[in-house]
A protein has these predicted regions:
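A conserved acidic beta->alpha catalytic loop
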Residues: 23, 27, 35-44, 81
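Residues at the starts of beta-strands that form the adenosine-phosphate
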Residues: 3, 29-30
Length: 254
């Protein structure tokens, strides 16, 4: 039977990490936490569990996750964020995969919680993620904000039953602050990669972002929460491309 290393990166996750670690009990053979020098109680909560706790300066989400993979003792990896946890059904599904590992990686549906409600649409569910994989067959790639584990060509991918539970925001204010921060990071990453934006680009992405998430993806079926999520998404897309255009213009002046 193959052994599994759970790998998590953290920074000030005292409100979430305990639940995440509890959900891994009895499922994985090792838990590796790579922490970016948290200033809250993240470290002491982790050390109450059977965790290998490593401090490492933050390099961006993609690079930090690749560094964390290098610290794992086993080749089969379960990658989680600190604000995620395994549902009971997903726990059972991972144990079955562990007993009969037939794929290079496994997809899982992620279910997101927002201000008292599990979101069913709004492009937030099923929110498919590749989180269980054989590490030698891929790596974390793409942009640092939109990183994903990329398997090599020809890799076989299976599907796990159950949901990966996700608590991405603690409040409306937290949602607003994080989306603003993600817009800035996204614009900077796009600029580094050579992307450009015209005067129309922010409006196109902002309007289409709302239409896609609220209408096409059924965000209206999530009620008031769906409207808030889709509105924030639209505003974030607009701000990201507005800042990208600003960065493009500043670069031309140099």
């Amino acid at each position: 039977m193959p052994k599994i290393s759970a790998v998590i990166i953290t920074y000030n996750e005292e409100n979430f990490i305990g639940r995440c670690l509890d959900s891994l009990d009895g499922v994985v053979d090792e838990i590796v936490v790579v922490d970016s020098f948290s200033t809250d109680h993240t470290e002491e909560i982790c050390k109450q569990h059977n965790v290998r706790f490593i401090k490492h300066a933050f390099e961006g989400f993609r690079d930090q996750k690749n560094y964390a993979l290098q610290q794992a003792a086993y080749k089969n990896i379960l990658s989680l964020d600190a604000d995620e946890a395994l549902s009971d059904t997903l726990r059972e599904s991972i144990l079955k995969a562990k007993n009969n590992w037939n794929y290079d990686g496994y997809m899982v549906n992620r279910r997101n919680y927002f201000c008292g409600k599990w979101i069913r649409f709004s492009e937030w569910y099923p929110d498919r993620q590749l989180r269980l994989f054989y590490v030698d067959h891929g790596s974390w790639g793409e942009l640092n904000l939109h990183e994903r584990f990329m398997l090599s060509n020809g890799a076989k991918i299976g599907k796990l039953k159950g949901d990966l539970l996700h608590w991405p925001f603690t409040s409306h204010e937290d949602h607003t602050e994080k989306m603003s921060r993600y817009s800035k990071i996204g614009a900077q990453e796009y600029h580094k990669s050579g992307r450009t934006a015209s005067i129309f680009t922010p409006y196109i992405h902002g309007i289409w972002g709302f239409m896609r998430t609220y209408i096409v993806k059924g965000g209206f079926l999530d009620g008031r929460e769906g409207f808030r999520i889709c509105s924030h998404y639209s505003r974030s897309a607009f701000n990201k491309y507005k800042l990208l255009r600003k960065l493009n213009k500043e670069a031309k002046k140099k």
